[in-house]
From Swiss-Prot:
Keywords: Cytoplasm, Glycosyltransferase, Purine salvage, Transferase. It comes from the Bacteria. This is Adenine phosphoribosyltransferase. The keyword Protease does not apply. Disulfide bonds: none annotated. One of its GO terms (molecular function) is adenine phosphoribosyltransferase activity. The keyword Nucleotidyltransferase does not apply. Belongs to the purine/pyrimidine phosphoribosyltransferase family. It is found in: Cytoplasm. Pathway: Purine metabolism; AMP biosynthesis via salvage pathway; AMP from adenine: step 1/1. It comes from Carboxydothermus hydrogenoformans (strain ATCC BAA-161 / DSM 6008 / Z-2901).
Length: 170
């Protein structure tokens, strides 16, 4: 199945010169959405993960059904101030400013084997921060999963030493 048929290019969104890759058509089509989750599962099942970690918010769209498909626990990584219990955080730089991500301190433990899911690999900063959170809790990061990878932004360079898997590349 050619997933690119279900990812629309939206020029000049959210600002001039940007081509936004819209995944909503992929999500709206039940067969395509199901196949996307199946493809992600096929890529990591042999790694024998214990948890699926996903990044707010679009990573949740793929991470939760992937965890369900694999029969694993789901761990959300959220933006600052969104988790109700004790958490750890990491801040990272964006092109214009910075962001902070958090994970509950009891979400993972030493010996856990995780795959981390997000919708798009762009610069790699968000994923690198998420890897740091998981490793600080003692988990082993087995793979980093993306539906889309924007090759020109070279996000893989920030993720050296990790298994990076993307379904569609632009």
């Amino acid at each position: 199945m050619d997933l690119k048929k279900y990812i629309y290019d939206i020029p000049d969104f959210p600002s001039p010169g940007i081509i936004f890759r819209d995944i909503t058509p992929l999500l709206q089509n039940p067969e395509t959405f199901r196949r996307t989750v199946e493809l992600l599962a096929e890529k990591v099942v042999d790694l024998r993960p214990t948890h699926v970690v996903a990044i707010e918010s679009r990573g949740f769209m793929f991470g939760a059904p992937l965890a369900y498909k694999l029969g694993l626990g789901f761990v959300p990584v959220r933006k600052e101030g969104k988790l109700p219990r004790e958490s750890i955080s990491v801040s990272y730089d964006l092109e214009y400013g910075n962001n902070t991500l958090e994970i509950h301190t009891d979400a993972l433990k030493p010996g856990d084997r995780v795959v981390i899911v997000d919708d798009v690999l762009a610069t790699g900063g968000t994923m690198k921060a998420t890897v740091e959170l998981c490793e600080r809790l003692g988990a082993k990061v087995e793979a980093l999963l993306f539906v889309i990878e924007l090759l020109a932004l070279e996000g893989r360079k920030k993720l050296t030493g990790k298994k990076v898997i993307s379904l569609v590349q632009y």
